[in-house]
């Protein structure tokens, strides 16, 4: 049902002229949350006096905790001060429960832009991953260092506290998942729940401390041209086709003057993942917007949409433009290429122990 509804939405959008004021309803599906399969509980052990045996046990306890922290293992002290090991190794079903919890929260919480937090979750996953530098091996989704200043204060990350806070109840419900895995899983979930392509995903990211924060300037600057775009994306290891596909995420959401300085949505359906961004980029006439903000463009037909200087650079550059035109004509090609590029983005710099063929494919909500 969900896939049929998404297909119908995309088909309707393809037949809707650019002057349409169509705004699709947000997914309102409801489903029961699966019961959590375990409880992470810590009981502090107290002893009236120390002896060599207890000291040795404590050494092993803390060593065990240090090793187990990234693997979902929990150690407990029982009433007799002995150590009991309970190991929890999450599998696909456990991550599906996390996915379902995010999807339900997206359906329930509709008090954000255009009725969905989905677009800002995609932006969080994108910005957490897009700091990767292939030469130094630093940055990327492994670490979730946007939890800390100065990275959380970088201009490109303005407004993403909303997305991070949105996911805190999910983190509390599933404390075993790292923030790094949670943020990227949330991005994959949002893409699928908003009608986009399947995003295969795998766990394995570990959170890092503030020392791993990346320097400012690694994310794309919307005011720049194609040379800047290539500099940013080539640094991560993407080619021109992948660059255009990833920028297609602008099909979702809108810009905010109090964050990026820009204003407005890119298309008429900012909570449905489509190829409309490319269709409008090619078919619509774009003119400079006259306002007090930074330079941006507005559509000549309705004057309600916007494009960024970096967006227009995609059709000014011959190599970029051929991919824009292909995606404008072929939604299926865009969906496939976006999925491949987004999976690559989410995995940059992650020291996985699993293989690519072990990625999970999550069921969408009904």
UniProtKB/Swiss-Prot annotation:
The active site is at 127 (proton acceptor), 266 (tryptophan radical intermediate). One of its GO terms (biological process) is hydrogen peroxide catabolic process. InterPro entries: Ccp1-like (IPR044831), Haem_peroxidase (IPR002016), Haem_peroxidase_sf (IPR010255), Peroxidase_I (IPR002207), Peroxidases_AS (IPR019794), Peroxidases_heam-ligand_BS (IPR019793). Its EC number is 1.11.1.5. GO terms for cellular component: mitochondrial intermembrane space; mitochondrial matrix. Signal peptide: none annotated. Residues 1-46 form a transit peptide. The record marks 123 as: Transition state stabilizer. Belongs to the peroxidase family. Cytochrome c peroxidase subfamily. Destroys radicals which are normally produced within the cells and which are toxic to biological systems. Its cofactor is heme b. This is Cytochrome c peroxidase, mitochondrial. CDD domains: ascorbate_peroxidase. It catalyses: 2 Fe(II)-[cytochrome c] + H2O2 + 2 H(+) = 2 Fe(III)-[cytochrome c] + 2 H2O.
